[in-house]
Amino acid sequence: MLVKADMTKDIAQVMAEVGRKAKAAAAPLSIATSEQKNKALNAAADAILEARADILEANRLDLANAEKNGMAASFVDRLTLNEARIDAIAEGIRTIATLPDPVGEVIAEWDRPNGLHIERVRTPLGVIGVIYESRPNVTADAGALCLKAGNAVILRGGSDSAHSSAAIHKALVKGLEAANLPADAIQIVPVTDRAAVGEMLKGLGGAIDVIVPRGGKSLVARVQSEARVPVFAHLEGICHLYIDKSADLDMARRIALDAKMRRTGICGAAETLLVDRAVASTHLAPILGDLAAGGCEIRGSAEVLALYPAAKPATEEDWSTEYLDAIISVALVDGISGAIDHINRYSSHHTEAIVAEDAQTVARFFNEIDSAILLHNASTQFADGGEFGMGAEIGIATGKMHARGPVGVEQLTSFKYRVRGSGQVRG
């Protein structure tokens, strides 16, 4: 149950207790069998479907507050739950249950000349703190992924989705209880005060092993600045789509429309369209016409405006903006070299896509752009753990340490070495 900050215990005490419970739950969870964890996940999926009416009612409360507070349409879309999205949440949890258990997997093994046999084996990270904004589905995704990887998790969602997240969390706890796993293995921060985030970033007295922020630039920047524990960071999704002169126009039109407009409020939505200057006279107008017909605002460079006068002028700020809305910035570039230069200058290193048929051009795109996910002849909206076969994701990591790209069950593990001998001494 979520409560306000005016309580008998102060925030630090409350959060210290949350950390203590998570640490205690992490030990038995780390040695839970695959069967136990899968039973908990499937039971949680059942509980979510059984609680459908309660979850939708809780979501209605959150949506009413969002409307009262005048939140943007893209924000409301991320917050909204409906029958189909609840079905998808439950199905995502079931899919995670079907994934191979990473815990105990032997990643590598070798023998030494002295007879020692060495194995590198996956282990849980321990306790993961997940701080996210108003996406109720993250409550389920993060809880389920951490459970599958044998980690306890502390969930701190945005206050705007508090009712929805609490209803989903209740179902996750039912799943744990059905498998005789500790209910404290998946906790939701019981206070809405933002001071709770500060306590999590301090590590809760050594209880938290890693923090995963999932949200806007200001949230992630705060986490990176203040965290005293390791962070899997995802700053923002300034994703680019480049249409090369070798591209099939019909394919380019389909991909551009999907990459921008399928869901505008997700981090994998394309925010900048780059078109090879060599085909601008034939390709630009059809592609932008499709986007405009779909309700997208076009912001173009001076060259783009000359070819497509319906566009609005783009400013320098547009090239580094994550709109999360039906807006796209458009520029012409000198082939693959121009596209690479633009992307490496403005990208957040999340996801970039190219539409092209020339193999050498595609090879340069893959080799010379340093982003977590690169796609060829496919929409940027495939930048998703579920689409990668991971069941779901806890976020898209844009850093380079430990995890990069979709953070699924494998990325939520560490490893240890098991060394087997037969009496060897170094002497």
UniProtKB/Swiss-Prot annotation:
It holds the Pfam family Aldedh. GO terms for biological process: L-proline biosynthetic process. It catalyses: L-glutamate 5-semialdehyde + phosphate + NADP(+) = L-glutamyl 5-phosphate + NADPH + H(+). Pathway: Amino-acid biosynthesis; L-proline biosynthesis; L-glutamate 5-semialdehyde from L-glutamate: step 2/2. GO terms for molecular function: glutamate-5-semialdehyde dehydrogenase activity; NADP binding. This is Gamma-glutamyl phosphate reductase. It comes from Brucella ovis (strain ATCC 25840 / 63/290 / NCTC 10512). Gene3D superfamilies: Aldehyde Dehydrogenase, Chain A, domain 1, Aldehyde Dehydrogenase, Chain A, domain 2.
